[in-house]
Amino acid sequence: MKYLNQHEAISVDEELFNEYKFSVDQLMELAGLSCAHVINDCYGSPQSTVKRKVLVCCGPGNNGGDGLVAARHLKLMNFDAHVYYPKRTEKDLFINLQHQCESMGITVSKDCPTLEWVEGEFGLIVDALFGFSFKPPVRESFAPIMDVLNKSKVPIVSVDIPSGWHVEEGPQDECNIQPDCLISLTAPKLCAKKLTNAKHYLGGRFVPPKLQDKYAMELPTYEGNNLFVKLS
Amino acid sequence: MKYLNQHEAISVDEELFNEYKFSVDQLMELAGLSCAHVINDCYGSPQSTVKRKVLVCCGPGNNGGDGLVAARHLKLMNFDAHVYYPKRTEKDLFINLQHQCESMGITVSKDCPTLEWVEGEFGLIVDALFGFSFKPPVRESFAPIMDVLNKSKVPIVSVDIPSGWHVEEGPQDECNIQPDCLISLTAPKLCAKKLTNAKHYLGGRFVPPKLQDKYAMELPTYEGNNLFVKLS
């Protein structure tokens, strides 16, 4: 299986929208749903000792949108989701995704959670801050939440890219979060090779075969109705 | 569990879009995906003797859109989908759903399949012609495909409503297709009580709890990551 560089990841994304005519609504729904399924599979079993209260940290772009979708589906799967979503856009889709969360009883807050509150309250953190278009360094307004993620002992599930990591080179000196689980979407990016002791899943079962071939992705087979594949 | 009348079904749908601010893209993707999952579960096992070539009949409205989405996901699950989609709209979403199918190698045709071809070629028919807003009688342009569905021995999976049935009263004298499987979306409609010897599934795992309560739906519990529940 191929690990995409940043340029390839951006190109694949553009082709899905421009050539294959998917809407952001469609693919974000499928991506966020696959994240919720991985989380439910990994941490949601009745035997799991992980608390079902989940902090979902959503960034300003599409990675954050995946997080908002995941939060909604997690709520329907009896997780207690709390969303931190500090920097919002005026795009209808994002306003509506937030509204959908709130009308299902999910709090969507601009207040950065403290380390103490996170450690005391949550069983899991979903990191949906930055995705494959991120370039370091992290902007100052996100420094407080990155500090919480860096210091917290609560397991982190990163959506597509561990936030703050370079998409190709991985952890940076100042941003070195270590997710317990990474959910690569569409295809893994190069930084996923720098994971240590993390579960790694692939989600986003929507890539047209012709596009897989064009980028020589060699994706693994999704079994049955699964929306994800466990890679390691 | 409650079976909705036509007025309730229309109201629930309107609330999902107007109050909960879902887009058609989002809910159609989830609905169509749940249909593909039911079909894969029911007919897609390696032990199944049903041929994996599926005729997906898509009507002019949202029921047809669910069919187009299901066809695309079925293709990704190694079913060989062929779409009959005679009456198309100018809406971007539908143009794009058709394009997505075609760019995955699915033929989308306006030519009504003959009974002989259907019987010889296909292992399954997905009936996504008319949904919960249908009122009999069937328009003349759909008479040929309804005739095929009425006469064919190939198992039919109906999406939300067996096409041609009255949403509340069920089979009509002139339209009395007998699906092998019905996938009710969101909540079953009254006509589902008139099924005989059919499998019955519920899909569309996206109904906000407050909306479920408002309509006293008393939906069954979706287990694990399943996007459907088997009702009978």
UniProtKB/Swiss-Prot annotation, chains A, B:
Pfam (any one): YjeF_N
Domain YjeF N-terminal, residue spans: 9-219
Function: Catalyzes the epimerization of the S- and R-forms of NAD(P)HX, a damaged form of NAD(P)H that is a result of enzymatic or heat-dependent hydration. This is a prerequisite for the S-specific NAD(P)H-hydrate dehydratase to allow the repair of both epimers of NAD(P)HX.
MF GO annotations: metal ion binding; NAD(P)HX epimerase activity; nucleotide binding
Entries under PANTHER family matching the protein: NAD(P)H-HYDRATE EPIMERASE
Cofactor note: Binds 1 potassium ion per subunit.
EC number in record: 5.1.99.6
Keyword GTP-binding: no
Cofactor(s) of this protein: K(+)
Keywords: Isomerase, Metal-binding, NAD, NADP, Nucleotide-binding, Potassium
Protein's UniProt name: NAD(P)H-hydrate epimerase
Positions annotated to bind K(+): 63, 127, 163
PROSITE patterns hit by this protein: YJEF_N
GO cellular component: mitochondrion
Catalytic activity: (6R)-NADHX = (6S)-NADHX; (6R)-NADPHX = (6S)-NADPHX
Organism of this sequence: Aedes aegypti (Yellowfever mosquito)
Residues that coordinate or bind (6S)-NADPHX: 62-66, 131-137, 160
Entry similarity comment: Belongs to the NnrE/AIBP family.
UniProt-listed InterPro entries: YjeF_N_dom (IPR004443), YjeF_N_dom_sf (IPR036652), YJEFN_prot_NAXE-like (IPR032976)
Gene3D superfamilies given in the database record: YjeF N-terminal domain (3.40.50.10260)
